[in-house]
């Protein structure tokens, strides 16, 4: 576009905006559709394998949601943090899954029970989904970002409900994050002589 438009031509800005809206999402859309199709095709085999597949499903949904609402964000209200919080936690969930599915086995460390891993993924992911949904809804009603207290202008039931949803979702997400931190710390700090018994317990749990 630089050879086509002069640097001071407003049409150049319009052209780059068009690329942002209509071209940039295409690669991500192809990857998401392909991944979703693969998951659906092998859903039964994957879900019976490890809890990390559930975590990846949650991450995929959350990341997709964040991407969609990103098209409706504004730089002045809470729709912007709704978008990037969903995207960041979606990526974080993927690394959480890798932590237990790849990194811990490579270090010969024990892996926690299935139910606790699933709990951390689901609580963090669903909590963040509601957190972002509340922020996005509040932004639609004009609640400004980067302000607190009376400056938020929570003068209607809709705004209060949206911010309440944000708070509840944030609390649920924090609980999921704390569970992960405790599990991760235990994996790293557990005594070597106890690792064998934990691995055996995990194998029985998976079976």
Q: Predicted segments — roles?
A:
Residues 66, 127-131:
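Alpha-helical transmembrane segments of multipass membrane proteins
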Residues 19-29, 84-92, 174:
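Alpha-helical transmembrane segments
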Residues 24-30, 157-178:
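Hydrophobic alpha-helical transmembrane segments
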Residues 64, 88, 125, 137, ...:
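Short glycine/serine/threonine-biased micro-segments
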Residues 2-17, 34-57, 68-84, 93-122, ...:
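Juxtamembrane membrane-water interface segments of multi-pass membrane proteins
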Residues 32-33, 64:
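Secondary-structure boundary elements
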């Amino acid at each position: 576009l630089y050879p086509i438009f002069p640097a001071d031509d407003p049409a150049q800005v319009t052209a780059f905006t068009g690329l942002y809206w209509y071209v940039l999402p295409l690669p991500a859309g192809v990857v998401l559709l392909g991944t979703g199709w693969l998951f659906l095709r092998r859903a039964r085999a994957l879900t019976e394998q490890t809890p990390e597949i559930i975590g990846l499903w949650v991450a995929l949904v959350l990341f997709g949601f964040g991407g969609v609402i990103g098209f409706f964000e504004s730089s002045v209200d809470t729709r912007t943090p709704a978008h990037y919080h969903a995207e960041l936690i979606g990526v974080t969930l993927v690394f959480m899954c890798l932590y237990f599915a790849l990194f811990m086995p490579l270090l010969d460390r024990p892996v926690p029970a299935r139910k606790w891993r699933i709990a951390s993924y689901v609580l963090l992911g669903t909590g963040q989904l509601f957190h972002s949904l509340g922020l996005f809804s509040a932004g639609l009603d004009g609640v400004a970002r980067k302000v607190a207290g009376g400056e938020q202008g929570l003068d209607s039931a809709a705004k209060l409900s949206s911010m309440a949803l944000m708070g509840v979702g944030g609390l649920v997400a924090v609980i999921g994050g704390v569970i992960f931190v405790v599990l991760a710390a235990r994996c790293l700090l557990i005594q070597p002589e106890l690792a064998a018994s934990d691995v055996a317990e995990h194998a029985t749990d998976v079976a």
